[in-house]
């Protein structure tokens, strides 16, 4: 499986993650945010593997992706991460 991610999407993601990390720091929460592009592989498995590599205490991700039918209430990638991960998963809108 392969996906192409437009540069604008990556830039927007970097900006959003930096803002979230700043807000958490202001609240006294130690956080690390990182945007990674998965070109080959399955997104859910890559997210779980990346979380393991960095020793994440929790995986935070959006509730919906770009697919309209894949997940009516919860995006299919988020759904898979919730069910496959042994780490806590926080879903945000």
PLM feature segments, named:
Residues 22-59:
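Structural beta-alpha unit
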Residues 5-7, 50-52, 77-78:
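Short, hinge-like loop/turn segments at secondary-structure boundaries
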Residues 1-18, 46:
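Acidic, proline/glycine-rich short linear motifs
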Residues 84-93:
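Intrinsically disordered or low-complexity boundary/linker segments at protein termini
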Residues 58-80:
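Glycine-rich, Arg-bearing micro-motifs that act as flexible, cationic patches
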């Amino acid at each position: 499986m392969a996906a192409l991610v437009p540069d604008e999407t990556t830039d927007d993601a970097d900006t959003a993650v930096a803002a979230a990390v700043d807000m958490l720091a202001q609240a006294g929460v130690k956080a690390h945010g990182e945007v990674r592009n998965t070109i080959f592989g399955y997104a859910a498995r890559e997210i779980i593997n990346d979380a393991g590599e960095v020793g994440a205490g929790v995986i935070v991700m959006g509730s919906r992706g770009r697919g309209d039918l894949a997940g009516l209430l919860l995006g299919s990638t988020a759904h898979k991460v919730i069910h496959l991960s042994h780490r806590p998963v926080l879903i945000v809108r």
